[in-house]
Amino acid sequence: MPVLSKLLPTLTLTLPLLAGPCLAAANPKLSKRFTFPIPSSTGSVTFSEPYEIAAGEIYDGELQTFGRGVECTGQDEGGESDTVFIVQEGGTLKNAIIGADQIEGVYCLGACTIENVWWEKVCEDALSLKEGSGPYVVTGGGAQGAEDKVIQHNSEGEVIVDGFTVYDFGKLYRSCGTCGDIQRSATITNVVAVSGSTIAGANGNFGDVVTIDSSNCATDVSAICTTYEADADGGEPEEVSTDVTEACVFEELPACE
């Protein structure tokens, strides 16, 4: 596989910060500057096709930057052939940076662990949970620049997100509202969320439950959790509420320091 020599620098980003509903006031230090804490890359690898992590395999990317050498196509739906990594049942991807030169980042085709994985710039989605019944565990790492979703949960089962950093995003987590009447759940802890629309979206009429406690922090985020009414026939979901509901269980979040 060809190796690219360019290293990925730490990105320093400037943004205005406002307090959203149920959020603490903006931190004055953060209002001056937010630095997305992506690690320095140890090298670059461009795949000509998706790299498959076998069932039960642990793949350590050693903090290299991985991509596909293509331009992002925005919110045009990609497919499995457009991914950087495909993780099979019980597989683990850790210590990797997903570069901006890709369309679909990572697919999990069963329970998976995503540990200390960073997205330089999200394209359509960062992580898509396509098959299986979980659990799907995301620990550490982070993503930025997601026009819409970071984690897309299509399959059934539980998602656990802990210690993730998300900046300049639409939704950190979204339970699929067009994938049929399937119950899904997510627990989100110790997340740093800066400059986004909503941390999570859940389908109340499908029995989804998203839990977000005060171990998380949020600055300039419009909503903590959004409840939708999904359409079992695949129609576009309707936003119902940004308050606490049976589907969205959350506490007031402090501003990020």
Swiss-Prot record:
| EC number(s) stated in the UniProt entry for this protein | 4.2.2.2
Instruction: State any single GO MF term.
Output: pectate lyase activity
Q: Which cofactor does it need?
A: Ca(2+)
UniProt keyword terms in alphabetical order: Calcium, Carbohydrate metabolism, Cell wall biogenesis/degradation, Lyase, Polysaccharide degradation, Secreted, Signal
Where it mainly occurs, coarsely classed, is: secreted
Reaction(s) catalysed (UniProt annotation): Eliminative cleavage of (1->4)-alpha-D-galacturonan to give oligosaccharides with 4-deoxy-alpha-D-galact-4-enuronosyl groups at their non-reducing ends
Database matches in Pfam families: Pectate_lyase
Keyword DNA repair on entry: no
The cross-references to SUPFAM superfamilies, in alphabetical order and at most eight, read:
Pectin lyase-like
**What's any one GO cellular component for it?**
extracellular region
State the signal peptide span: 1-24
| Cofactor binding summary note | Binds 1 Ca(2+) ion per subunit.
Localization of this protein: Secreted
* GO annotation terms (biological process): cell wall organization; pectin catabolic process
Q: Which residues cross the membrane?
A: none
Q: What class of enzyme is it?
A: lyase
| PANTHER family from the UniProt entry | PECTATE LYASE F-RELATED, PECTATE LYASE H-RELATED
Q: What family does the Swiss-Prot or TrEMBL record give for this protein?
A: Belongs to the polysaccharide lyase 3 family.
The UniProt function text for this chain reads: Pectinolytic enzyme consist of four classes of enzymes: pectin lyase, polygalacturonase, pectin methylesterase and rhamnogalacturonase. Among pectinolytic enzymes, pectin lyase is the most important in depolymerization of pectin, since it cleaves internal glycosidic bonds of highly methylated pectins. Favors pectate, the anion, over pectin, the methyl ester.
State the name under which the record lists this protein: Probable pectate lyase G
Q: Which organism is it from?
A: Emericella nidulans (strain FGSC A4 / ATCC 38163 / CBS 112.46 / NRRL 194 / M139)
Tell me the organism's taxonomic lineage. Answer: Eukaryota, Fungi, Dikarya, Ascomycota, Pezizomycotina
The protein's gene is named: plyG
